[in-house]
């Protein structure tokens, strides 16, 4: 167990070091869901939340493609946005079932296309009670020195919308 936690810490730390020792900024969204954490984690753990969000937001996401993998660590996922001229590609680098944490590192697109040197997306499913939890979505990012004056930021709205979609989907299926 200690080895797993140490490895996860090392992996996340290595990604943060990829920001060339720049200070990481964070955008965070939290949403309470009246469903147990295990049910929410089932949706977030692999590709379920990406597929559900694409299905529910066809005016935002044109399609999703799995470029590598099966939804586990190492999976590379590409989201193409409407009207199809922009995209975002990420690699799942941590999936921790015990802590219900999923981390993805941006590879291209998103804020990387407008001046960020690193973009790391993390989902934490935090149990509150047996039938309630919090979906915490966090984007950590660093801005390249030459773009600091422009203050580029990733957009957390899609992650917030995905959490709302998950909430509606899971709470309605509980009834």
Where are these regions (language model features)?
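Hydrophobic ligand-binding cavity/cleft-lining segments
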Residues: 2-70
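Beta-strand/loop substructures that line and gate deep hydrophobic ligand-binding cavities in soluble
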Residues: 103-161
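A short, structured loop/turn motif at beta-sheet edges
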Residues: 37-38, 69, 93-101, 124-134
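Intrinsic-disorder/low-complexity, polar/charged segments enriched in Ser/Thr/Lys/Arg/Asp/Glu/Gln
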Residues: 24-30, 61, 74-76, 87, ...
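Glycine-rich portal/gate segments that line the openings of hydrophobic small-molecule binding cavities
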Residues: 51-55, 61-112, 173
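Hydrophobic pocket/interface hotspot
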Residues: 40-44, 77, 92, 104, ...
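Short amphipathic alpha-helical signal-transduction/dimerization elements
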Residues: 48, 160-175
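Hydrophobic/aromatic beta-strand elements that line small-molecule binding cavities or substrate pockets
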Residues: 29-31, 88-94, 118-127
């Amino acid at each position: 167990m200690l080895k797993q936690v140490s490895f996860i810490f090392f992996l996340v730390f290595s990604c943060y070091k990829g920001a060339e020792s720049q200070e990481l900024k964070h955008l965070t969204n939290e949403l309470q869901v009246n469903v147990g954490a295990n049910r929410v984690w089932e949706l977030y753990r692999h590709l379920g939340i990406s597929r559900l969000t694409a299905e529910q937001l066809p005016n935002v996401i044109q399609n999703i493609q799995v470029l590598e993998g099966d939804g586990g660590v190492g999976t590379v996922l590409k989201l193409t946005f409407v009207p199809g001229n922009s995209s975002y590609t990420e690699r799942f680098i941590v999936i921790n079932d015990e802590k219900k944490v999923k981390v993805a590192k941006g590879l291209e697109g998103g804020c990387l296309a407008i001046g960020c040197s690193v973009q790391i997306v993390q989902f934490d499913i935090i149990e509150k009670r047996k039938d309630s939890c919090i979906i915490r979505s966090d984007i950590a990012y660093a801005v390249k020195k030459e773009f600091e004056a422009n203050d580029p930021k990733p957009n957390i709205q899609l992650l917030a919308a995905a959490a709302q979609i998950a909430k509606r989907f899971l709470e309605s299926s509980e009834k």
